[in-house]
Regions:
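Bacterial N-terminal signal peptides that target proteins for export
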Residues: 1-10
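Hydrophobic h-region of N-terminal signal peptides that target proteins for export
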Residues: 9-20
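Scaffold/interface architecture of coatomer-like assemblies
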Residues: 19-313
């Protein structure tokens, strides 16, 4: 499978919100919905998972929207593990591998996972599977050498996730220890953020940057923070390598405890413009909500689906 990603260009088609055959359908009928996966934490960073619908308000370009669907549910996810395999990761890989496996073990049993190891190029070492044996083999495929093609690897992983992922909710976990040194100039950070927003992929990142030169660490943080913030994920920067396992378990827990919020935009035009999304929440502990910051008003960004009204339990 090595070299699979070279030259991979996959058009982003309109996604469907129809549930998979082994899932309870979320929606039915005909409508156009913008679907958000939202995390809520209190001032101490603890996830709040039992807030009512009336605690939330959703705004698009400043205009309040009517929430059509609201629920908190542990839905199966398509997950991509994008792991830095450059030369500087050689002494860090063992702990990163263990943390990656612990995340998978703590995830929904119906999740599907693929693994990309990257250095100067990206390698698809394991296609989508929930076979733990295959995942262990892929994560343990150590060949730490070369540079860090961070942007290229994330871009290609988004393409693969959108083309092959069978679950409606899609997540990338990126683990790296340095700034990009090998990506081409085609995928600038701005273009990559646009792609992430158009693809509706949640991006979580772990930056092992404590040993990086301050200037290089700052550039790496800009990439990881921009992608995580725009997509509704979060970037972590542990001071010690030993913290990685705890972070991986925290990410797995968050993915399984997000709110699903959907609305039909008051502005129905599919004019290709970017629509800013802002969600507020009220509750104990001064809660803060995190979700994607917007979408492009196209068939891919605000999904034309055959699903509209919630099929509530």
């Amino acid at each position: 499978l090595r070299g699979f990603f070279k030259g991979l260009l996959i058009p982003l088609a309109a996604a469907t919100l129809l549930a998979q055959s082994d899932e309870v359908p979320l929606f039915k009928a005909d409508s156009r919905l913008v679907v958000l996966h939202a995390s809520v934490v209190d001032r101490k960073g603890k996830l709040l998972t039992d807030l009512p619908e009336n605690a939330f308000k959703v705004y698009e370009n400043g205009a309040e929207q009517n929430i059509k669907v609201f629920r908190r549910e542990d839905v199966p996810v398509s997950i991509g593990m994008v792991i830095d395999n450059s030369g500087s990761m050689r002494d860090k890989r063992a702990k990163v591998e263990r943390a990656s496996l612990d995340l998978v073990k703590a995830s929904n049993p119906q999740d599907e996972v693929f693994i990309v190891n990257f250095n100067d190029e990206a390698y698809l070492d394991v296609e989508f599977t929930n076979d733990m044996r295959l995942l262990e083999q892929g994560i343990a495929r150590i060949d730490s050498r070369g540079g860090t093609a961070l942007r290229d690897s994330i871009s290609m992983s988004i393409d693969y996730l959108k083309e092959k992922g069978k679950k409606d909710k899609k997540v990338l976990l990126v683990i790296t220890d340095g700034n990009d040194t090998a990506s081409n100039d085609r995928d600038t950070l701005e273009k990559l953020v646009d792609k992430a927003q158009k693809s509706e992929v949640l991006i979580f990142a772990v930056g092992l940057l404590s040993e990086e030169e301050p200037h290089e660490a700052k550039k790496a943080k800009r990439v990881l923070n921009s992608l995580a913030t725009a997509s509704g994920g979060l970037a972590y920067y542990p001071k010690e390598l030993a913290e990685v396992d705890e972070i991986a378990l925290r990410v797995a827990h968050e993915i399984r405890n997000q709110y699903i919020i959907a609305y039909t935009p008051t502005n129905p035009a599919l004019d290709g413009t970017f629509r800013q999304i802002h969600v507020t929440v009220k509750g104990p502990g001064s809660p803060v909500v995190r979700t994607r910051t917007g979408y492009y008003a196209t068939a891919a960004g605000a999904r034309e689906t055959k699903a509209a009204s919630a099929r509530m339990p």
